Swiss-Prot record:
SUPFAM superfamilies tied to this protein: GroEL apical domain-like (SSF52029), GroEL equatorial domain-like (SSF48592), GroEL-intermediate domain like (SSF54849)
Keyword tags: ATP-binding, Chaperone, Cytoplasm, Isomerase, Nucleotide-binding
Free-text function comment from the UniProt entry: Together with its co-chaperonin GroES, plays an essential role in assisting protein folding. The GroEL-GroES system forms a nano-cage that allows encapsulation of the non-native substrate proteins and provides a physical environment optimized to promote and accelerate protein folding.
Known partners and oligomeric status: Forms a cylinder of 14 subunits composed of two heptameric rings stacked back-to-back. Interacts with the co-chaperonin GroES.
Recorded family membership: Belongs to the chaperonin (HSP60) family.
Single GO cellular component term: cytoplasm
Top-tier EC class: isomerase
EC number, UniProt record: 5.6.1.7
GO biological process assignments: protein refolding
Localization, UniProt: Cytoplasm
GO MF, one annotated term: ATP binding
Catalyzed chemical reaction(s): ATP + H2O + a folded polypeptide = ADP + phosphate + an unfolded polypeptide
Protein name, as recorded: Chaperonin GroEL
């Protein structure tokens, strides 16, 4: 086992604070409307330019092991805030740095670290409750657009696009961000349910100009099996032909003789048919087929439940107003499924989302909810160069997370004002002893840090502005973009309550651990001499 380097007490804490400061100073220059860019070197390709706090934090590794431990712990704050609310990473880092710096000063002055931590925790619990009372629901498009604009670093077009997307696909709808092809940002909305499987044969195409299959009011056959024998399908095909409607077959696969016969029938105009593979794999495919069945009012023909394809009737088939199939995707528009059944299915999937353990599963389940409940919107980000595209895409992603958080828990006044008001409200808070009271003061003083940093990045004097804001009340604050004071809500400067709350909770959690650190252990660096000795046997 390698020899260890151990540091105790103040020696350890000073080193740790140095690491915290290096990381936090790099991250906090990005805060606010006048935040600066950070350029990150990449081992290949052009450097990345970003104003996203967590992207900066992730890049930082320090040479000194003890300093690096401090930096990595604050990196955890940014990552956790990002995972919980998708934004507020810089705010969380600034808060953590402020609490750690003030807390370690108090420890150096002889306060009991455990009592300090208890005081900080008490202040944060009270602050979270206070934030909830200040929170205003965020339901209209205007407020959603404002939240998106602030989070995308004051880019109004992004805010408007996100609000429009939420308008089209509902609060539950899936909104994805992709690379655009032009210079402008675009919004692409897919109504109905879309999945990424295309036609099994190009001979099904009936709209050559678009290279797609478009079927009006078709029957939809859902089969959880491979179909290769046409005899199994004859009864259904005959019934559909009599009804004079087209047929869409969604099965695990349609191959060989069965596919050839369907193609011949289509080309001769006997019955309009199109076949596609079912989306997903394994259990997920079964679940998605069931989703489509619920949406279209059909039944999945599955041998697991004793149903045979030969015995399927028109009653077992789903229906929709229109189905559009191209090379890679299938879209079912206006399925005739009962609203009650669809809502029941959505509720069932939501329950699974709550119980999901992996992010991947959760994401897939949320996509299924969106496809059943609303639709899918794609924001295509336009930019002149790839470097700009990456930077802009990261901002749009942040803005999207922020607006979702705002819809979930409401909004508070932005620009660091909400935390200043909370701190003022809790000024009279006391605990069991003097050291705990100091802990409360440390947390309350740190709550001013985001406002001060926003002002500092805008090139103004933080103390002057902070005092002016504290002299006001309610939503009165400082708009760093226009350098004027006024009502932050009227200025359209809003922060999602969830983002502010998460930032404060995670910052206090990690800061509390660091303040109560008494010893740090790391591997001793191997001496250069030992390295040279190891390489000595390599004669030329």
């Amino acid at each position: 086992m390698a020899a260890k380097d151990v540091k105790f007490g103040n020696d350890a804490r000073v080193k740790m604070l140095r690491g915290v400061n290096v990381l936090a100073d790099a991250v906090k220059v990005t805060l606010g409307p006048k935040g600066r860019n950070v350029v990150l070197d990449k081992s290949f390709g052009a450097p990345t330019i970003t104003k996203d706090g967590v992207s900066v934090a992730r890049e930082i590794e320090l040479e000194d092991k003890f300093e690096n431990m401090g930096a990595q712990m604050v990196k955890e704050v940014a990552s956790k805030a990002n995972d919980a609310a998708g934004d507020g990473t810089t705010t969380a880092t600034v808060l953590a740095q402020a609490i750690i710096a003030e807390g370690l000063k108090a420890v150096a002055a002889g306060m009991n670290p455990m009592d300090l931590k208890r005081g900080i925790d008490k202040a944060v619990v009270a602050a979270v409750e206070e934030l909830k009372t200040l929170s205003v629901p965020c339901s209209d498009s205007k407020a959603i657009a404002q939240v998106g604009t602030i989070s995308a670093n004051s880019d109004e077009t992004v805010g408007k696009l996100i609000a429009e997307a939420m308008d089209k696909v509902g609060k539950e709808g899936v909104i994805t961000v992709e690379d655009g092809t032009g210079l402008e940002d675009e919004l692409d909305v897919v109504e109905g349910m879309q999945f990424d499987r295309g036609y099994l044969s190009p001979y099904f195409i009936n709209k050559p100009e678009t290279g797609a299959v478009e079927l009006e009011s078709p029957f939809i056959l859902l089969a959880d099996k491979k179909v290769s024998n046409i005899r199994e399908m004859l009864p259904v095909l005959e019934a559909v032909a009599k009804a004079g409607k087209p047929l869409v077959i969604i099965a695990e696969d349609v191959e060989g003789e069965a596919l050839a016969t369907l193609v011949v029938n289509t080309m001769r105009g006997i019955v309009k048919v199109a076949a596609v593979k079912a989306p997903g794999f394994g259990d997920r495919r079964k679940a998605m087929l069931q989703d489509i069945a619920t949406l279209t009012g059909g039944t999945v023909i599955s041998e697991e439940i004793g149903m045979e394809l030969e015995k399927a009737t028109l009653e077992d088939l789903g229906q929709a107003k229109r189905v559009v199939i191209n090379k890679d995707t299938t879209t079912i528009i206006d399925g005739v499924g009962e609203e009650g059944a669809i809502q029941g299915r959505v509720a069932q999937i939501r329950k699974q989302i709550e119980e999901a353990t992996s992010d991947y599963d959760r994401e897939k389940l949320q996509e299924r909810v969106a496809k059943l409940a609303g639709g899918v919107a794609v924001i295509k980000v336009g930019a002149a160069t790839e470097v700009e595209m990456k930077e802009k895409k990261a901002r749009v992603d942040d803005a999207l997370h922020a607006t979702r958080a705002a819809v979930e828990e409401g909004v508070v006044a932005g620009g660091g004002v909400a935390l200043v008001r909370v701190a003022a409200k809790l000024a009279g808070l006391t605990a069991q002893n003097e050291d705990q009271n100091v802990g409360i003061k440390v947390a309350l003083r740190a709550m001013e840090a985001p406002l001060r940093q926003i002002v500092s990045n805008a090139g103004e004097e933080p103390s002057v502005v902070a005092n002016n804001v504290k002299a006001g009340e309610g939503n009165y604050g400082y708009n760093a973009a226009t350098e004027e004071y006024g009502n932050m809500i009227d200025f359209g400067i809003l922060d999602p309550t969830k983002v502010t709350r998460s930032a404060l909770q995670y910052a206090a959690s990690v800061a509390g651990l660091m303040i109560t650190t008494e010893c740090m252990v790391t591997d001793l660096p191997k001496s250069d001499a030992a390295d040279l000795g190891a390489a000595g046997g390599m004669g030329g």
